[in-house]
Amino acid sequence: MDDPRAVVHSLVRRNLGKDKTIFGQPVKAVPGRVAKSMRPEEAFRATLSDCLAQITANAATLRPQDSRDERRSVEGLHQLRVSFRRLEVALGAFGREFGQDWLEELRGRAKILAGRLAPARDLDVFVVKLLSEPPKSGVAGGLPQLRARAEAARDNAWAGVAACISGIDFERFADDVAALASSQLPLTRDQRLARTARRMLDRQVRRVKRRGKMARSREEGDLHQLRIALKKLRYTAEFFAPLYPKRAVTRYLKQLRGLQNYLGDLNDVANVRRVVGELMREKVKKDDDSAMRFAAGAMVGWYGAQVPGAVKQALKRYRNFKRVTPFWQ
């Protein structure tokens, strides 16, 4: 059977939702199709196609079947953001390796579209996960109002998601990426994929090391930059994983994903202050205000008290990760 991923971008975008047995569930990244026999340009195009397939498949899980159908797949939105981030990394990493600065414009468009999805994802995490974890003692009176405020903001954010995936910017972006993935534009003179992969992976490791040194400050922004650098390393490693022994790849990626997920959870906690601050900026009735604001402040304080210990554990995990031998070296 032919691999359908080369054409799934157009198939899903035009027909998705008509056959729920095929396209009804959120889609995680497919294993890379990069092969040792490929030239660097071919590996780039295969990676673009896979990223776009994931984008269009997950966007489709969020599109309504009719006017009465309201799609809200928390996991589908999460995987859609992941697929945009993977595509950003592919365009940035390959673009730098090939010396093709014009790919930065396409990467910027991916970043803009991903940014339009961010408010809904942040509020999903806040409502589904973060609101349910703090102790309720002493703040129960204000939590229902805080939840109602968050749910209303979440509804608005999800309306933004619907507008994004049905808008012309999304449509044109998908078409442009599909065209690039199927083009034969000369992008590099280097014909040796193994050497290209090693350079790109080493470049990501150097970025991680720089961010790791900065993260010793334990400042929120520096830890955030380390998380982003690790994410770029992980995605690049996954792109080229088929070129290397499976056992070594699996061992390395297991450590990398564990560290990245831990920093991701820490980032969610750090976002509580920002999300609550945005919710509190809206005007409310005076009789609801004090209880809700007390609950909001207690929530920020409860999560904030956990941050120092979590940061300490994150840096310990990072030190352990540094001792893991990269599978391409």
Please place each PLM-identified region on the residue numbering:
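Cationic, histidine-enriched alpha-helical/coil surfaces that engage anionic ligands
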Residues: 1-329
